[in-house]
Curated annotation (Swiss-Prot):
Organism for this UniProt entry: Staphylococcus carnosus (strain TM300)
Record-level GO cellular component terms: ribonucleoprotein complex; ribosome
Protein name: Large ribosomal subunit protein uL23
Family (UniProt): Belongs to the universal ribosomal protein uL23 family.
Its job: One of the early assembly proteins it binds 23S rRNA. One of the proteins that surrounds the polypeptide exit tunnel on the outside of the ribosome. Forms the main docking site for trigger factor binding to the ribosome.
High-level lineage: Bacteria, Bacillati, Bacillota, Bacilli, Bacillales
Cross-referenced NCBIfam families: PRK05738.2-4
Keywords carried by this UniProt record: Ribonucleoprotein, Ribosomal protein, RNA-binding, rRNA-binding
One of the record's GO molecular function terms: rRNA binding
Superkingdom of origin: Bacteria
Subunit structure, interactors included: Part of the 50S ribosomal subunit. Contacts protein L29, and trigger factor when it is bound to the ribosome.
Presence of keyword Ribosomal protein: yes
Keyword Ribonucleoprotein: yes
InterPro entries in alphabetical order: Nucleotide-bd_a/b_plait_sf, Ribosomal_uL23-like, Ribosomal_uL23/eL15/eS24_sf
């Protein structure tokens, strides 16, 4: 899996924006990607040093549309902590 396939998009929420002050950046990642692949992808794309990676899995939720029932897509989110002295990613 290539670096551009691992990272899907950055997660921009109030909680993730507050975490940026602590050098923590949040990304939606491919559901098959592991911590090592996420670390390599962030270091390759943004040219920074990664300290650690935490991964959160979200299960699909049931949703109804009238009488029809379906599921949302499952997601995987990675919180990447950069080493001190690294450049800000989004600034």
């Amino acid at each position: 899996m290539e670096a551009r396939d691992v990272l899907k998009r950055p997660v921009i929420t109030e909680k993730s924006s507050e975490a940026m002050a602590e050098n923590k950046y949040t990304f939606d990642v491919d559901t098959r990607a592991n911590k090592t692949q996420v670390k390599i992808a962030v270091e390759e794309i943004f040219d920074v040093k990664v300290d650690k990676v935490n991964i959160i899995n979200y299960k699909p939720k049931k949703k109804r549309m009238g009488r029809y029932q379906g599921y949302t897509n499952k997601r995987r989110k990675a919180v990447v902590t950069l080493k001190e002295g690294s450049i800000d990613l989004f600034n």
